[in-house]
Amino acid sequence: MLEPDDIALFRGAVKGVKALKQDKFIAPRQKMSKKKSTLRDIREKEDTLFYFSDEYEPLLNEESAVRYLREGEDSHILKQLRRGDFSPELFLDLHGLTKEQAKIELASLLQACENEHVYCASVMTGYGSYILKRQIPRWLVQHPKVRALHQAPKAWGGDAAILILFEV
């Protein structure tokens, strides 16, 4: 609390000050309603979810480290991802989520990366029963904005995480 001397000093400093009457300025109404905003977000997520098919089986080597490079990209990018030269700006932790919940969260991450112009993100799948660890790369390779992905280096999660490089 304040000391009595401090209170007296403050009162002496503001003595004679009059409160302003607010009658001239009217705050502008907010242009966009919350309904429209959430509707737009839902549409963007649906657009992103469009790319995630559970039936698609890409040619990924599931016995070694997870990695993918989009056709036409420089192979040096995979080496940079493996070494941790790209540091992720956004992180997504999927521990404890179901496959459907993970798909929605992954779509949200991709949309956030696109909206915020983020070029690298990390998805933590965890160890668990390996369902998400196998499925996440299958979904990611279907998205046109994903340039490359690789199992994260130990500093960013190791076996339990995937680094993703996006087209910005």
Swiss-Prot record:
Keyword Ubl conjugation: no
Cited NCBIfam families: PRK04946.1
Gene giving rise to this polypeptide: smrB
Alphabetical GO biological process terms: rescue of stalled ribosome
Organism: Pasteurella multocida (strain Pm70)
Function: Acts as a ribosome collision sensor. Detects stalled/collided disomes (pairs of ribosomes where the leading ribosome is stalled and a second ribosome has collided with it) and endonucleolytically cleaves mRNA at the 5' boundary of the stalled ribosome. Stalled/collided disomes form a new interface (primarily via the 30S subunits) that binds SmrB. Cleaved mRNA becomes available for tmRNA ligation, leading to ribosomal subunit dissociation and rescue of stalled ribosomes.
Top-rank taxon, per record: Bacteria
Similarity field: Belongs to the SmrB family.
Protein name: Ribosome rescue factor SmrB
Pfam families reported for this sequence: Smr
GO molecular function: RNA endonuclease activity; rRNA binding
